[in-house]
């Protein structure tokens, strides 16, 4: 199943919330993304059926290996793109919003170049 942007956003939100809180419920995801609980329920059903997440009997969400891989890829893109934008003088809030838009559409090759460029900046080679 090909994930749409929203599916990637849900997986990224679960990853971020897990890092912050240790455990994640649908209501946490709704708050993080600013969507309704019914919207989250529909999305979680689709992500479960696609094998990206599991939900235990207490309603706790977990990423499967497949879901973890997607979430990590999107979250890395988000962080790198936001850092590059802030390095260009974009404020943190705008950089985060723009990174969220770009992270879904940028090619792997272009992202690799951006990541390498940021590493050169951090290493003092630029």
Predicted feature descriptions by range:
Residues 97-126:
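C-terminal regulatory/oligomerization modules of transcriptional regulators
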Residues 26-57:
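Canonical helix-turn-helix DNA-binding module
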Residues 59-77:
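Basic, amphipathic "hinge/linker" alpha-helix immediately C-terminal to the N-terminal HTH DNA-binding motif
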Residues 2-35:
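N-terminal helix-turn-helix DNA-binding core of bacterial DNA-binding proteins
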Residues 75-108:
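Arg/Lys-rich, alpha-helical DNA-contact motif
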Residues 32, 70, 87:
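Residues within the alpha-helical elements of helix-turn-helix
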Residues 12, 42, 97:
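DNA-binding alpha-helical recognition surfaces that contact promoter or target DNA
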């Amino acid at each position: 199943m090909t994930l749409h942007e929203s599916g990637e956003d849900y997986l990224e939100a679960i990853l971020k919330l897990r890092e912050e809180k240790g455990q994640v419920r649908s209501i946490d995801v709704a708050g993080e993304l600013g969507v309704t609980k019914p919207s989250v329920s529909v999305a979680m059903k689709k992500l479960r059926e696609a094998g990206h997440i599991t939900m235990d009997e207490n309603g706790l969400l977990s990423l499967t290996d497949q879901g973890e891989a997607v979430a990590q890829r999107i979250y890395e893109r988000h962080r790198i793109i936001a850092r590059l934008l802030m390095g260009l003088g974009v404020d943190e809030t705008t950089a985060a919003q723009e990174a969220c838009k770009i992270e879904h559409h940028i090619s792997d090759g272009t992202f690799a170049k951006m990541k390498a460029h940021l590493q050169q900046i951090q290493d003092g080679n630029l």
